[in-house]
Each structure stands twice: as structure tokens, then as C-alpha cells.
């Protein structure tokens, strides 16, 4: 299939960019962007490659994404080697095809076509690309955003190319994401022999009533844009492995995906109050990986919806479900942020694939967003 979007996607897939290794993907993108007049600023931190690129001045529309991918798993189970892209029955197979090298290719080609048509565009078109999204995300977009904010860089709109669609490209646009807060809780007891419980203090028994109440809390009812806050216990560890030893400690890890109805401080306060209610001895560690954010109807959402309706003749759903994305960092800049990308049915799976025609359509949608906001 001869198509600049598909050809670039294949070139990116051939580079085995296991997070946080970029494997040359950004060099390929930078070469294409510089050729059409972009100024490119590499922003590497630690083992992570990032770049910020821009063309023009004024109101700024940035396209954001990541070049890194998750491991392929058992390569023998793929219909084709995972880093040797192939097209079968109109589907482009390869690790990263959907998440998210297909989107990156669509962004770059859309920019090339846009600049050719509007060489003197009125606004500023930008790219924020990282190689650290799938793993720790500590040296990627968050560090670039901190740098840009420190120098008062302008960012009005940001389109993240995460695979947002479910059945057909553009059927779902993510216009926000829930916050994510993890609690690492250790309940302290006194280790002892199971035959002499009066000489010990079993932390599992101590914690059980508290955990029962915790899992039954209704944190909120959600709102127009967000489902109710959820809390899930992810890990529980206790004991020595022996059947005659009362454990000395119990470790419980639980995660909150919370809406804009709550703050992380509200959640923390309620958990601590519950621990105090049951008079537990404990140690707490919190990890806030992202605050909730929401982009309401405005210029960016309207432009994205218009592009989808124009090219795919469907009205997209505006949703905030799913996991976190780098949009949570970009939203700190005060920008309107949405996510639009290909169908996500096979991301992180064996035989990850994307409809090749969808990538061509996505490039046209991206270009139309550019035309509406910075032409």
C-alpha cells in the first residue's frame, strides 16, 4: 500500500522502541518536521528522549504522543514478527501500530500537508513527543511540561494521539481523565505463635473490619462527565508462609480512580479517619500519578468533533473513562486537552493491529483540526 501515512507508520514500527528506548523514532520524525520549517528542541532527561518542536507564532496547537511501546510478548505467537510491520486484509500489524506509532505518522503527514497548503499559517503548530509513557513516565512529558511552564511557554490546545476509539476511528474522544491515587498501607501487629494468640496481635484480623468498610464506601456519584469514583484493592501481603505463625505486619495496596467531585486530599483524609476509627497502628505512603482533568465544549472539542463528523459522518462520544495518559501533565499548562486516535481493541496485545484506512482518515482529521485552529 503506497501511502505516506502507512509508510511512515511502518518505518516507526520497525524501530523496536521498548520503553524508554526511542530506537531512532524521534530522529525520523524530527527530520520530517525540520524539512517543513519546524524548530526542534531536544529535551532529554535521564534515559528518556523527548522533543518540543514548533512552527509559527501566537495561539498554539500542540500534538502530543509517545514513541515507546510495551514489550511484544511471545514473538512466536504473532502472525508476523512484531517489529516487522505487515498489512493483511487491510490491517497493519506490528507492536505500536495502534499505540501509538500510527497516530504519530498521521500527525506528521497531517502537518506536512497543512504547511504545504498554509505556509504562512497564523497560529503556532507544535509537537511534544516522548519515549517514556508506557513505563515510569517520570522523565517524559511531565519533565517537558515543567520546563515549558518554567519559561512561560504558551500552549492553548493539545491533541493527544492516544488510541481513543472503540469500534471505528473517531467514535470516542477523550475530553478528560480521572485522577489516580495509590495508597500503600502497612498495618502493624505483633508476630507470634498461632497457638498463643493472646501473646500476639494479628494485623489481618485488626484490618479486616476497616477494609470491609473501606470497600463499601460510596465516594461520590460522579457527574455529567465522570463516572463515580472507584476504589480497588490491588495487592495484599502478609504472613511468613508458615501455618503456625501469626504475621507481624499486613500490607495492602489500593488505588482510587477519582472524578472532579473529589480531591486527593479529601480521599486521604477519609482513609486516615477510617484507620483512626479502628485504632490501627499503621504506616501510609501515597502516590498521586495524576489529577483529574476535563476539557469542556470549546474551540478544541468543537474542532475535533467537526473533523470527525466531516470525514467519518459520525457524532463522537465525549468520554473520560479508561486509564491515565500524558494529557494529565499537559493539562497543568491550562491548555484544552483532548485525545483522538485509532481503535484500541488490540493495544498491548499479541498481534496488535490497526486498520490502515483508519490511519489515512486520522491524518485528514488531524489536518482539519489544524485548519480550524491555526490556519
From Swiss-Prot:
Name the catalytic site residues: 68, 133
Q: Spell out the SUPFAM superfamilies in the cross-references.
A: Bacterial exopeptidase dimerisation domain (SSF55031), Zn-dependent exopeptidases (SSF53187)
What cofactors does this protein use?
A: Zn(2+); Co(2+)
Sorted alphabetically, the keyword list is: Amino-acid biosynthesis, Cobalt, Diaminopimelate biosynthesis, Hydrolase, Lysine biosynthesis, Metal-binding, Zinc
For this protein, the Enzyme Commission number is 3.5.1.18
Record: residues binding Zn(2+) 1: 66, 99, 162
From the UniProt record, give the pathway where this protein acts.
Amino-acid biosynthesis; L-lysine biosynthesis via DAP pathway; LL-2,6-diaminopimelate from (S)-tetrahydrodipicolinate (succinylase route): step 3/3
- Identify the domain of life: Bacteria
Positions contributing to Zn(2+) 2 binding: 99, 134, 348
Annotated catalysed reactions: N-succinyl-(2S,6S)-2,6-diaminopimelate + H2O = (2S,6S)-2,6-diaminopimelate + succinate
Identify one Pfam family in the record. Answer: M20_dimer
What Gene Ontology molecular function terms does this protein carry?
acetylornithine deacetylase activity; cobalt ion binding; succinyl-diaminopimelate desuccinylase activity; zinc ion binding
Which biological process annotations from GO are given for this protein? diaminopimelate biosynthetic process; L-arginine biosynthetic process; lysine biosynthetic process via diaminopimelate
Cofactor binding mode, per the note?
Answer: Binds 2 Zn(2+) or Co(2+) ions per subunit.
> What InterPro entries does this protein map onto?
ArgE/DapE_CS, Bact_exopeptidase_dim_dom, DapE_proteobac, Peptidase_M20, Peptidase_M20_dimer, Peptidase_M20A
- EC category name: hydrolase
**NCBIfam families for the chain:** dapE_proteo, PRK13009.1
Give the protein's function.
Answer: Catalyzes the hydrolysis of N-succinyl-L,L-diaminopimelic acid (SDAP), forming succinate and LL-2,6-diaminopimelate (DAP), an intermediate involved in the bacterial biosynthesis of lysine and meso-diaminopimelic acid, an essential component of bacterial cell walls.
The record's listing under HAMAP family reads: DapE
Q: Its quaternary structure?
A: Homodimer.
The entry assigns this protein to a family as follows: Belongs to the peptidase M20A family. DapE subfamily.
Q: What is this protein called?
A: Succinyl-diaminopimelate desuccinylase
Question: Gene encoding this polypeptide?
Answer: dapE
